[in-house]
Design a protein with these regions (language model features):
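Long, mid-chain structured domain cores
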Residues: 26-133
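Cytosolic nucleotide-utilizing catalytic cores of signal-transduction proteins
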Residues: 103-283
Length: 283
């Protein structure tokens, strides 16, 4: 058998984790999506006439193919990109359930390929998922016989709704270039991969830089605040003195920026990302 994990049935009904392939007029072969390779996915796409064997519902259509309307209006979106270097088909379902449990603000998830999964998060109220995933990664890999790398995407507010598909694809393209070169398990922030990508040729798609810069410009005094924090190695008291404002006022702006974007200006990786974005404004 080519697909020993498959099963035959007399109707095309398949759950969200399966794909149904017509064998005859009254017989379909059901396969688990997680067991399919990229080549098999393309073959099934040709056989079924679908764009992809990994048809993950409305969010998949909206983000991957830029089709339809945003399935659910939320004030801020974040994408968690997961790539599995090693996995066992028998444990994928349990791993997905665990991920849905530890990401309480998840509103959807879908499969991009046999090794790639996306979780869509509602970050209207900020949930620090990076810390949760870093704390649990080793246990997850051990419990479910997996080796995976995770990228925490940037938080994008609803004002960029028309660009969500392009932003998602730009994020994922950067993540793919990362794991193709650095194949080890870890949890990485958007800032880490963005700064890594700056040093590579054509790794950062312009829309990422453009939209982040727009966010910075939308916040009062933020360019000056980022520059002052950079010059004072993120020491808030010194930066406030340089800006001639009260320390609490500066802290308010820092907290407001984190609430909007998840970026922490007192954390040097996030601060470096923001400083790179404002360099053209201050040079």
């Amino acid at each position: 058998k080519w697909f020993p994990q498959g099963r035959l049935q007399s109707n095309p009904n398949a759950n969200e984790n399966e794909v149904a392939i017509p064998i005859s007029s009254n017989q379909w072969l059901l396969l688990k999506k997680s067991s399919l390779t990229e080549r098999e996915q393309e073959l099934i796409s040709l056989l079924t006439g679908k764009d992809s064997a990994f048809d993950g519902g409305p969010w998949y259509d909206y983000l991957v193919h830029n089709r339809g309307k945003m399935p659910q209006n939320v004030q801020k979106l974040q994408f968690v990109h997961c790539h599995l270097f090693h996995y066992e088909n028998e444990t994928i379902g349990s791993w997905l359930e665990m991920m849905r449990t530890i990401l309480p603000n998840r509103i959807a998830d879908f499969q991009l390929s046999s090794q790639d999964y996306i979780f869509v998060l509602d970050q209207t109220r900020l949930v620090p998922v990076k810390d949760v995933l870093r704390d649990t990664l080793s246990a997850i890999e051990y419990d479910f016989s997996l080796t995976l790398t995770i990228k925490i995407g940037q938080i994008w507010p609803l004002i960029f709704k028309e660009s969500y598909s392009e932003l998602f694809q730009a994020e994922h393209a950067l993540f793919v270039k990362w794991w193709e070169q650095v194949q080890h398990s870890n949890v990485h922030s958007f800032s880490q991969l963005f700064l890594w990508g700056i040093g590579q040729k054509d790794f950062i798609l312009p829309i990422l830089t453009k939209k982040l810069h727009q966010l910075i410009e939308s916040q009062d005094q933020l360019v000056d605040i980022i520059a002052a924090l950079w010059e004072n190695t993120a020491v808030v008291t010194k930066a406030a003195q340089q800006l001639y404002i009260h320390r609490n006022t500066l802290q308010y702006h820092i907290d407001k920026w984190e609430e909007l974007t998840g970026l922490q200006l007192k954390e040097l990786t996030d601060l470096t990302l923001c400083y790179q974005l404002i360099l053209p404004d201050i040079l």
